[in-house]
Design a protein with these regions (language model features):
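Conserved, mostly hydrophobic/aromatic
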Residues: 39, 61, 83, 115, ...
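Short beta-strand segments
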Residues: 59, 131, 178-184, 231-233, ...
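Hydrophobic residues within beta-strands of alpha/beta enzymes
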Residues: 79-80, 100, 128, 230, ...
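Short acidic/polar capping segments at secondary-structure boundaries
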Residues: 106-107, 133-136, 144, 184-188, ...
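Active-site loop/helix belt of alpha/beta enzymes
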Residues: 148-149, 155, 165, 172, ...
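Charged (often Lys/Glu-rich) extended helix/loop segments that serve as interaction or gating elements
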Residues: 292, 306-338, 359-524
Length: 524
């Protein structure tokens, strides 16, 4: 099952709604919820697109809940971490160092020393991905410092534990750490500027021209760093495969060039970035990206191709599986002030665009709903202008089946037929618009209407935008969908808000409390 398939997500709401209401009753609101069936479906889709011998690792920055990391480990995914903190969480989840990679733009000396110590102890990380010549030099210093203190006996003992070519080399019994060099492919990722990492102006990675300096800083082919290949990551939420294809092509070409002088240079890690869009928005699935690889590899001489290929998906594995259950605090009816209610400027983080009142088409009252989940639980709408659908679980105290799903059903069916044909996409848009208009007419009499949903935080950017919802009152329940990635992982205690609980809905429908709600004592 494609984890980005709108139909699958639509079907899951009908199954999950009773469980979401029960979670609110049992654990309170707001609460993070993970649908394990959706996680398993997403993992199966990625595994099908990138089967063995691909090395697959889950990027913890998407959602670092140890219980979730452990579930993904059981589904064949190691861990990609960007700090000792994430490394500790992966270890707590049962992932061995041999299946953990350390990356990230902000590795400290302490992070690098920890990687060197792990190698010295005979339990090295799979590799460390280096971002700059400075970082290569810092890791080399850390390795040399530990190596100088090791006894010959310790070296031989550690080498015997790492006969697979990682950590210590058995032949040279000197401490070495496997590393990749992160390539900045200098391509246009065609995504939100806040999610782009492979552009020329990005802070991430080394350009091709900077590679030689990093190799020298790390001590060259015989130094304390064993250079194993290249890592690249174009960006997140990639709307098309073109930029990814160009980046992988450049990575393969550079790897082939460097492999001539570095026999150990045998690995290409292509990162992640596979998109998950709001329902009804067409995006390429992981298989679309994977289908680019055979032609790219065929263009490289056989003796210069990578022996190991790796991916590091994050969002695509967990985003669709996540929900936030929240409770209504206020409902207001207002005629807009001398300026349309502030809306997020989709072009930039944490900025507002105010539409002049003259631009309004009528003076109808606007329904405003404030819920008890906000930017502290889901930062993405305020940070990126990300869109997350809000659906009603109860209306005036009674359980409801969200008519919003009908909108998504029509849009999803239309977009699904559109594929990549421009004319089909135009027809799909018209079909979706017509379906929404019919829903407007059918639901108006029953009180369903567009409602602006805001959070409880003392910031005007704390809003989730407009959503079609039934009549609501204080105490009613709503759910925010597609929050499994960069929701709980980016939460904050701003305004003195404790951490919400995190609950799994198991495949059989039972509930598992994966993390308890934080108390007031946990603040400060």
């Amino acid at each position: 099952v494609d984890p980005a398939t709108p139909g699958e997500a639509r079907d899951r709401l009908g199954v999950l709604a009773p469980a979401l209401r029960e979670i609110a009753r049992r654990y309170g609101t707001p609460a993070y919820v993970t649908d394990i069936a959706s996680v398993e479906a997403a993992a199966a889709a990625v595994g099908s697109a990138f089967p063995a011998p691909w090395e697959r690792r889950y990027s913890l920055k998407a959602n670092d809940l140890p219980a979730l990391v452990a579930r993904l480990a059981g589904l064949g995914f190691g861990a990609n971490v960007v700090s000792r903190g994430e490394w500790a969480l992966a270890t707590r989840a049962g992932v061995p160092n041999a299946d953990i990679t350390l990356e990230g733009i902000g590795k400290t000396d302490a992070d690098l020393r920890a990687a060197a110590r792990a190698a010295a102890a005979g339990v090295p990380l799979r590799w460390v991905a280096l971002e700059s010549a400075d970082e290569a030099a810092a890791l080399a210093r850390a390795v040399r410092a530990i190596d100088d203190r090791m006894t010959a006996t310790a070296r031989v003992a550690a080498a015997g534990q790492v006969a697979a070519g990682r950590g210590l080399g058995v032949g040279d019994v000197r401490l070495r750490v496997d590393v990749l060099l992160r390539l900045n492919p200098e391509v246009d990722p065609e995504t939100h500027r806040g999610l782009a990492t492979g552009a020329a102006v990005s802070k991430f990675g080394l350009t091709a021209d900077e590679m030689a300096a990093a190799l020298d800083a790390g001590g060259g082919p015989d130094g304390p760093l064993r250079f194993r290949g290249l890592h690249l990551h174009v960006g997140s939420q990639l709307g098309a495969a073109g930029a990814w294809r160009d980046a992988v092509r450049r990575g393969l070409a550079l790897l082939a060039l460097l492999r001539g002088g570095l026999p150990t240079f045998d690995t290409l890690d292509v990162g992640g970035g596979f998109p998950v869009a709001p329902l009804g928005v067409p995006v390429p699935d992981p298989g679309r990206f994977a289908r680019e690889l055979p032609a790219l590899l065929a263009a490289i001489p056989a003796d210069r191709r990578p022996d190991r290929l790796a991916i590091e998906p994050g969002r695509v594995l967990v985003a669709r599986a996540g929900w936030i259950v929240a409770r209504v605090l206020h409902v207001r009816e207002r005629i807009g002030p001398p300026g349309e209610p502030a809306r997020l400027d989709r072009s930039g983080p944490l900025s507002l665009a105010v539409v002049p009142r003259e631009a309004r088409t009528d003076d109808r009252a606007e329904r405003l709903v404030v819920i008890d989940a906000g930017m502290t639980e889901l930062m993405r709408p305020a940070l990126y202008g990300a869109e997350h659908a809000v659906v009603a679980l109860t209306s005036r105290g009674h359980a409801v089946a969200s008519a919003l799903e009908a909108v998504h059903t029509g849009r999803s069916a239309a977009w699904g037929a559109a594929a990549a044909d421009r004319d089909a996409i135009r027809a799909a848009r018209q079909a979706a618009t017509g379906h929404s208009q019919r829903l407007d007419e059918a639901s108006a009499a029953s009180g369903w209407r567009l409602v602006r949903v805001d959070g409880p935080i003392c910031e005007s950017t704390d809003t989730f935008g407009e959503h079609r919802l039934p009549p609501l009152r204080r105490g009613d329940l709503v759910a925010i969908r597609d929050t499994g990635a960069y929701g709980a992982a980016m939460r904050s205690a701003y305004n003195g808000r404790p951490r919400p609980p995190e609950v799994f809905v198991e495949v059989d429908g039972s509930l598992t409390l994966a993390r308890r709600r934080g108390g007031l004592a946990s603040l400060g």
